[in-house]
From Swiss-Prot:
PROSITE patterns: RIBOSOMAL_L23. The keyword RNA-binding applies. The keyword Lipid metabolism does not apply. Part of the 50S ribosomal subunit. Contacts protein L29, and trigger factor when it is bound to the ribosome. It comes from the Bacteria. Belongs to the universal ribosomal protein uL23 family. GO terms for molecular function: rRNA binding; structural constituent of ribosome. Disulfide bonds: none annotated. This is Large ribosomal subunit protein uL23. SUPFAM superfamilies: Ribosomal proteins S24e, L23 and L15e. GO terms for cellular component: ribonucleoprotein complex; ribosome. Pfam families: Ribosomal_L23 (PF00276).
Length: 94
C-alpha cells in the first residue's frame, strides 16, 4: 500500500492541537485496513521524523437523517502518532 493511501488527512481540532503541544502527539485519519506498523513507516517516511508509538481507534459512522429517510456515514480509522523528543511536524501551525 502506498504511503499516500495510508494517511488520508490530518485531524486538526482543538483537542488534537492541545495534545500536540502537551504530549507531541499528532492525529490522522487513516485507511481502515492499515496497521500500526504501516502507519508508523508512512509517517516516518513522509515527514522525516522518528515515531515512538502509534495508537489506533476504529470510529463508528453516525446515523444521519434527512427528512424521514435515514442514512449512515462510513466507518473510519483514527491514528494517534506519538513522536520522539525533538521531533515535530509544522503543518499544524496556523
Amino acid at each position: 500500500m502506498n504511503i499516500y493511501d495510508i494517511l488520508k488527512k490530518p485531524l486538526v481540532t482543538e483537542k488534537t492541537t492541545l495534545e500536540k503541544d502537551a504530549k507531541n502527539v499528532i492525529s490522522f485519519e487513516v485507511d481502515r485496513s492499515a496497521n500500526k506498523i504501516e502507519i508508523k513507516n508512512a509517517v516516518e517516511k513522509l515527514f522525516k521524523v522518528e515515531v515512538s508509538e502509534v495508537n489506533t481507534v476504529n470510529v463508528a459512522g453516525k446515523l444521519k437523517r434527512v427528512g424521514r429517510h435515514y442514512g449512515k456515514r462510513s466507518n473510519w480509522k483514527k491514528a494517534y502518532v506519538t513522536l520522539k523528543e525533538g521531533n515535530n511536524v509544522d503543518f499544524f501551525e496556523i
